[in-house]
Structure formats: C-alpha cells, structure tokens
Amino acid sequence: LIYMYLLNRHPLRGGKVWDIDPAKDEELSMGEKALFIEHPTDKTNRVKPQDLDKSQLPQGDPTKLPYTICGPYLKKLFDRAFIDGLHNPSARPSADEWEDALVKTCDLVQPCQNPKCEAHWYVFDNTTKPRCPFCGTEYKGQLPILNFYYAPSHGKYMSENYRLMVYDKQTLYKWHSNRLVSANEKTTDEDKKPVGDFHFFNNQWILI
C-alpha cells in the first residue's frame, strides 16, 4: 500500500500477460508468477508506457518516476518486500521498520524551488545538486543537512543512519535530539511539541 500511495501505481501490475484468461492471469500475476515491475535484473514484467492512459502518466511509468525517488530508507524496504520477500514472507520488513523508514524519509523531504511544480516537495537524492524528479528543477543555494549521531559511551560517537534536511522554517522535534523518543502513535503530546526551528536570515542559517 505504501508503494501505491506514494507512486500511484501497483508494484506487480506490469506489461506481462501470464494467461489469456483474465481471471487466471490475475491469479498468476498476484500469486505464483508475481514479479516486481521495477525488478533490477528481471525485466519480464516491465510496464509498457504505450499501453497506459494519459491520466496514468507520468506516475504509471517507472522509467520517468522510479521507486528510488522515495529515498534510500524506503527503497531498501521496497527491495525487501518486492524482490527478496515477494515469495518469501519471512524476508519482508516489519510494520515497525516501515514506520521508522517513513519518519526518516519525511525528514529528507525538501521544497522544490519551482513555484509552478505540482508536487512542491521531493525527497533529497543525496547529491550535491539535487533536482526535483517531478519538474526537473535543480536546487539553487545553500542546503544544510544534519547527520545524527549518538554516544554509546563517553567520547565515542556512532551514526544513527538518520539525516534531517534543513530549509527555511524547518522544525526540530524532540525525537531529533533524543534517540529515546520516537515519532509514532505512542508519542506523547508533550514530545510532539517543537523544540526549535531553522531560519535563513541575512544570508545566514540560525536555529531558534
């Protein structure tokens, strides 16, 4: 469902017809013969853009908007769900892993500088010159990124594999500064309160 909501297409409905009987084809494509439409090596079930309605484009065409635009955290889980675990349920991500990846992905979202862009936002692509995948606009200007670390012992720091994109009026929450606090359905109202925000003022970044 996460793949479908974010990309507006089904991860298994590609161009491959497994049987001339529609009912049998549906059964095979969703079961025994199920194959991820963006599988990196098996292209059997690739989407055929020429068969799509105009209303399904560009979202329906993975060559235009590949699942990698969802960022590294979700990309990793999509691989486990639709490649490693498609026919091996034990290899699929847990609900907690999906929740954690969604939170981390939200913190990688940055605004598109094109006022006419229909998407308005996109996930940082981890390059020095990020470009909006929806309208093609390259980001101009400073783009600070916070990398989070924790100290398992005095003087020792380890990466949390967690980053926060900084943009004007970006908000800092307690779970960004305290790894014992998580952003989920159990987060208390007190922990949901912002603890700071970033502003670009007089050509400088400040944290209030």
Regions found by a protein language model. Name each.
Residues 2-75:
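Conserved C-lobe activation region of Hanks-type protein kinase-like domains
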Residues 74-109:
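Terminal C-lobe "cap" of eukaryotic-type protein kinase domains
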Residues 160-162:
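Short Lys/Arg-enriched alpha/beta "domain-start" segment
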Residues 165-208:
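Forkhead-associated
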